[in-house]
């Protein structure tokens, strides 16, 4: 999450969540609105953790902010729940909305995804993310107000603290 301070999960966290979801027949939904579509150096942030969500939501990154678009992508298992006749691939729930027929968002998204792929931007994100994480780590070594740096790819954060030992957050007025 970005709003929470670019908190990265501990090793095994997502695998455990998926295990619990499977055990109790709960659908695993992962929100990739902030960290998806290349920001972490893979198409989706969850790909770093070896899980297979049932549903993934994404928005901003799909068209790099050039057009308003949001998506819900599901597994085939979830998609089949919306079919009246599971044997007919065209017999599914359809939702019509005010802007449902507008092709600007999908066109921008398709072009954006093509550019990300053609220009190897995932690889670039990995390389630049390593460079930036190293630079932030170097800054942390020289400035006691940086208590931690973390993240993946270019989805990074630096935690500002007034005391590095106990990680007391920096007073907002000083920031």
Question: What is the role of each PLM region?
Answer:
Residues 1-175:
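Conserved N-terminal phosphate-binding loop of PLP-dependent enzymes in the Aspartate aminotransferase
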């Amino acid at each position: 999450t970005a709003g929470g301070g670019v908190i990265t999960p501990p090793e095994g966290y997502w695998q455990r969540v998926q295990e619990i979801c499977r055990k109790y027949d709960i659908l695993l939904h992962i929100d990739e609105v902030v960290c998806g579509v290349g920001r972490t150096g893979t198409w989706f942030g969850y790909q770093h953790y070896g899980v297979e969500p049932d549903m993934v939501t994404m928005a901003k990154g799909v068209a790099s902010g050039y057009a308003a678009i949001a998506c819900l992508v599901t597994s085939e298992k979830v998609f089949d729940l919306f079919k009246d006749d599971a044997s007919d691939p065209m017999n599914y729930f359809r939702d019509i909305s005010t802007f449902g027929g507008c092709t600007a968002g999908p066109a921008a998204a398709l072009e954006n995804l093509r550019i990300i792929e053609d220009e190897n931007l995932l690889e670039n994100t990995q390389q630049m993310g390593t460079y930036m994480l190293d630079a932030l780590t170097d800054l942390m070594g020289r400035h006691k107000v940086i208590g931690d740096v973390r993240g993946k790819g270019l989805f990074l954060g630096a935690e500002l603290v007034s005391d590095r030992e106990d990680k007391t957050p920096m007073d907002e007025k000083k920031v």
